[in-house]
Structure formats: C-alpha cells, structure tokens
C-alpha cells in the first residue's frame, strides 16, 4: 500500500511539473526527471526484482500505468507547446497584404545581341549558314592567309592585342572564313558573327566589339549579286528605302573593294560596311582554285548598326550596364 501511494504522489507531482513547463527545453527536463534512467520511477522498476511474483505482478502493472500516464501527458504538452511556438512565429512574421507589392523585374535580350540576331536572320533566309571560330587566333589565319603582309599597319602592336609573336585576339572574324574554306568545298555561303578586339577606345570605338562578316564562294558570283544582297539587307534592317552608294576602297583581302554608305535624314552620307570580291591570293591560300571559283565578302560592325538604328551617339553606353538605358530595348 505504501508503494502504491508513492506512485500516486509521483504521478501528481509529474503532471503538475508537466503543466508548469513553459517551453520545450523545460518539458524535456521534466521528462528526464520523471522517466529517465535515474528517475524515481526507474528506481522502483529496478526494485521489482526483489519482490515475490504476486507482488511483482501488481506493482509492475501500477508502475506501467504511471509511466503511460506521464508519457501521454508529456506528448500532449509537447504538442501544445509546439503549436503555441508556431502561432507566435506566424504572428511575428505576418505579411500585411494591404501594402503595395513590388513589381517583377523582367530581363530582356541586350540590344547588341538583338541587332546581331536580326542581321543573321536576314542572311539565313537568304541561304547563308552561321559559322563560328576561335577568338584567340594565330597570325596565319588572322593576317597571312588574308593577304595582309608583314608591314601592314594592322599588324602593329598599337592596333592588335598579342599574346606572343604568333597568337593574338582576333581583329576580325575573317579567320572563320579561311578555316571554313580550308575544310569545305564550294559553293560556300556563310556569315560569321562574333566578338573581335582592337586597341581602340573612344566615343565610336571599343577594345571589344562585335562584327558580322559574310562570304560566298561559287563558280558564278559577281559584284552585282553582292550589291543587290547588301542593299536588301540595309533596306530590311532599317525598314525603309535608303539611298545607298558604293565607294571604291582598298582591303588587302578583296579586289575590287568598296565601302558602303547610306544617306541619313539630314542628307549626310554615313559609312556602314565594307565589301568586295575575294582576292585570288586569299582563295589560293585556302586551297581553292581562283581560276574556277569566285567569291565576295563583306563585313559590318554590329554596334555601328545598332547606333544608327536606335539613334545612339556613344558606343560605350552599350557596355555601362545602365538599366535605364537598356530597358528601352525590352
């Protein structure tokens, strides 16, 4: 009878301690105190071994009942404390849905990329394929194979970024044309977009800029065909019928060569690109017989086209990461 009363008192004390626990840490301390390995309940369980069988049966059942009562109370209190903690957290993190929301920032394609894709799309519709090549180029593909002699100004250190005597950052995408001619048989019809590099930086020049060059090699190409293609490009890109003129010029890799101008709204001629018939030496260097095949080539600056199309007077604005400027092209 003495042990049974002790269990009743233990149960009462444990339930009171459980109810008084104000957080999960305190509740765990109560659990250890009343059901742990060193608790009074554990000591009474050890004492069962010294009792006779009949008494052990009665007291064992009583101890089990007390343990179950305490564990149930612990579980209920734990659930209540967890719910209270969650409610408190939700209350402290409540969002005022009456406040104005923040607009979603929407990204867009960079204007230079937009212009490059627009130009490439024109040429792919005309039957050209897009070809790419390395930006770190060797001297042969960047200069030698393009009929650019060793004394040419473009080879000077102040115009070209050199890694060593034979490797450099390409100054144009013409090297892609040479590599394509070396590995393909005519007819060849490609455009070569990409980044190019020159030692130049001012309002209309950048050390890094984008070019698109084109090449068409076949048995019966002509300057008239080149002229018609480029006039169609300019009219479609600027979405108007432009006055276009072809001025005689000089490029080492084309002969004859021309620069192409368009007339603006004020009646001024603006240079937009260069072109010409591929020089026989260039065809020969790529392993193509110039007596059998002819070709024409052209090259334009993507930023130049973008500036003319959108009325931008400083090329550097494209690369200043000013969202106010770039947002206009979204």
UniProtKB/Swiss-Prot annotation:
It comes from the Bacteria. GO terms for biological process: phenylalanyl-tRNA aminoacylation. The keyword Nucleotide-binding applies. Its EC number is 6.1.1.20. Its cofactor is Mg(2+). Mg(2+) binds at residue 255. It holds the Pfam family tRNA-synt_2d. It catalyses: tRNA(Phe) + L-phenylalanine + ATP = L-phenylalanyl-tRNA(Phe) + AMP + diphosphate + H(+). Coiled coil: none annotated. Keywords: Aminoacyl-tRNA synthetase, ATP-binding, Cytoplasm, Ligase, Magnesium, Metal-binding, Nucleotide-binding, Protein biosynthesis. One of its GO terms (molecular function) is phenylalanine-tRNA ligase activity. One of its GO terms (cellular component) is cytoplasm. It is found in: Cytoplasm. Binds 2 magnesium ions per tetramer. Belongs to the class-II aminoacyl-tRNA synthetase family. Phe-tRNA synthetase alpha subunit type 1 subfamily. Tetramer of two alpha and two beta subunits. This is Phenylalanine--tRNA ligase alpha subunit. It comes from Acinetobacter baumannii (strain AYE). The lineage of its organism: Bacteria, Pseudomonadati, Pseudomonadota, Gammaproteobacteria, Moraxellales. The gene is pheS.
């Amino acid at each position: 009878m003495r042990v049974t009363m002790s269990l009743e008192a233990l149960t009462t004390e444990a339930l009171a301690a459980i109810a008084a626990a104000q957080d999960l840490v305190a509740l765990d301390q109560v659990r250890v105190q009343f059901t742990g390995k060193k608790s009074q309940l554990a000591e009474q369980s050890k004492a069962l071994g010294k009792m006779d069988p009949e008494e052990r049966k009665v007291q064992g059942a009583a101890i089990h009942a007390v343990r179950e009562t305490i564990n149930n109370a612990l579980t209920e209190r734990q659930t209540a404390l967890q719910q209270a903690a969650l409610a408190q957290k939700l209350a402290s993190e409540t969002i005022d849905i009456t406040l104005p929301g923040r607009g979603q920032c929407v990204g867009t394609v960079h204007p230079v990329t937009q212009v490059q894709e627009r130009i490439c799309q024109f040429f792919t519709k005309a039957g050209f394929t897009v070809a790419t090549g390395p930006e770190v180029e060797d001297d042969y593909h960047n200069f030698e194979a393009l009929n650019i002699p060793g004394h040419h100004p473009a080879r000077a250190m102040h115009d070209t970024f050199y890694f060593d005597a034979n490797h450099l950052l390409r100054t144009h995408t013409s090297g892609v044309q040479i590599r394509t001619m070396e590995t393909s048989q005519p007819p060849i019809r490609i455009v070569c977009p990409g980044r190019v590099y020159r030692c130049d930086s001012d309002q209309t020049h950048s050390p890094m800029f984008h070019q698109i060059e084109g090449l068409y090699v076949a048995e019966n190409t002509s300057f008239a065909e080149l002229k018609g293609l480029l006039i169609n490009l300019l009219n479609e890109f600027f979405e108007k019928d432009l006055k276009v003129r072809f001025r005689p010029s000089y490029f080492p890799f084309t002969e004859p060569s021309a620069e192409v101008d368009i007339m603006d709204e004020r009646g001024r001629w603006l240079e937009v690109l260069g072109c010409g018939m591929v020089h026989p030496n260039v065809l020969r260097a790529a392993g193509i017989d110039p007596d059998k095949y002819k070709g024409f080539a052209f090259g334009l600056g993507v930023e130049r086209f973008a500036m003319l199309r959108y009325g931008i007077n400083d090329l550097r604005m494209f690369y200043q990461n000013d969202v106010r400027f770039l947002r206009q092209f979204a």
